[in-house]
Curated annotation (Swiss-Prot):
This is N-acetyllactosaminide alpha-1,3-galactosyltransferase. GO terms for molecular function: glycosyltransferase activity; metal ion binding; N-acetyllactosaminide 3-alpha-galactosyltransferase activity. Binds 1 Mn(2+) ion per subunit. The lineage of its organism: Eukaryota, Metazoa, Chordata, Craniata, Vertebrata. Gene3D superfamilies: Spore Coat Polysaccharide Biosynthesis Protein SpsA, Chain A. The conserved DXD motif is involved in cofactor binding. The manganese ion interacts with the beta-phosphate group of UDP and may also have a role in catalysis.
Length: 371
């Protein structure tokens, strides 16, 4: 049996004590580290959860606010306190006229009497302080036969309560009739070159309108209508007709099928529309829109007219044929029912509730030099 010296025994004991203390300290440090890591994880989870909860509440609250804003906007629109443009279904109710076609395949409205909310539209456009232009051409004997009636009736019924500028194109401005205009209405008269044939007068108006839009009309009006002079207003032609690109259904063809329409059918013409194509037959006696849209329309139509002249061909219905070709590929954003340009020679069917404009008697033998 080996006897360990006392001082060595003390050293060994002290060494063991230090080792055990070091081991305990190491274990304690590890546990603290583990606790710290767990604490950080728990804290991170809590923070992420808090962020998610806050984000969820924000999204829902934002959505709620958006719904409230929409509802407030609707209420303001109903009360006339907003200048936000009314949406189609705010002012247009096609169900009021189930017996007629009221919406095109491309979802544009066809405006009939009873389908629109006049009061709502008037509130909006009155606050917009719009100006509407109206071009009309009167040459030769058309001046004495039609111009005065057209202007006097337009002054009474066209865009009542809004600023209007009548642009009158004449080949002899000295024959301009005296017309008393309403306070919000003004008149600009321009002299244009006389043409030998009425067909050329009809077609050249596209060029003339385009030139005047570029020169001054685009800076003067918000909307522009172009109309034939041989017709007369009979009732309000109001803001329900305004749109970016507005077309007029031709009274004689609004119930016909496209293959029956008198489109230009000769392939050589720029106005050619083949059988099996087409939507409606549009009347060149009334069309309108914003100045930029009318500028594009007149440019394209006149381009087609010039192309036909190069090929020594003339479209069947002149500028109207080219107008129909344009609308085939540039769909109108709004269409006016035949009530807005009606021919009483057809009679008065039950679906024609309120005639806005009526054709005048076509005395071609008196007003045209080459019938």
């Amino acid at each position: 049996m080996v006897t360990m010296p006392q001082d060595l025994h003390v050293k060994v004991s002290m060494s063991r004590s230090k080792s055990e203390t070091s081991l305990l300290s190491s274990r304690s440090g590890s546990q603290e580290k583990i606790m710290n890591v767990k604490g950080k994880i728990i804290l991170s989870v809590l923070m992420v959860s808090t962020v998610l909860v806050v984000f969820w509440e924000y999204v829902n609250r934002t959505h709620s606010y958006q719904e409230e804003d929409i509802e407030r906007a609707r209420e303001k629109g109903r009360n006339g306190d907003s200048i936000v443009e009314p949406q189609l279904w705010d002012w247009f109710n096609p169900k009021n006229r189930p017996e007629v076609l009221t919406v095109t395949p491309w979802k544009a409205p066809i405006v009939w009497e009873g389908t629109y909310d006049t009061a709502l539209l008037e509130k909006y456009y009155a606050r917009q302080k719009i100006t509407v232009g109206l071009t009309v051409f009167a040459v030769g004997k058309y001046i004495e036969h039609y111009l005065e009636d057209f202007l006097e009736s337009a002054n009474k019924y066209f865009m009542v309560g809004h600023r209007v500028i009548f642009y009158v194109m004449m080949d002899d401005t000295s024959r301009m009739p005296a017309v008393h205009l309403s306070p919000l209405h003004s008149l600009q008269v321009f002299e244009i070159r006389s043409e030998k044939r009425w067909q050329d007068i009809s077609m050249m108006r596209m060029k003339t309108i385009g030139e005047h839009i570029l020169d001054h009309i685009q800076h003067e009006v918000d909307f522009l209508f172009c109309m034939d002079v041989d017709q007369v207003f009979q009732d309000n032609f109001g803001v329900e007709t305004l749109g970016q690109l507005v077309a007029q259904l031709q009274a004689w063809w609004y119930k016909a099928s496209p293959d029956e329409f008198t489109y230009e059918r000769r392939e050589l013409s720029a106005a050619y529309i083949p059988f099996g194509e087409g939507d409606f037959y549009y009347h060149a006696a009334v069309f309108g829109g914003t100045p930029v849209h009318i500028l594009n329309l007149t440019r394209e139509c006149f381009k087609g007219i010039l192309q036909d002249k190069k090929h020594d061909i003339e479209a069947q219905w002149h500028d109207e044929s080219h107008l129909n070709k344009y609308f085939l590929f540039n769909k109108p954003t709004k269409i006016l029912s035949p009530e807005y340009c009606w021919d009483y020679h057809i009679g008065l069917p039950s679906d024609i509730k309120n005639v806005k404009i009526a054709w005048q008697t076509k005395e071609y033998n008196l007003v045209r030099s080459n019938v």
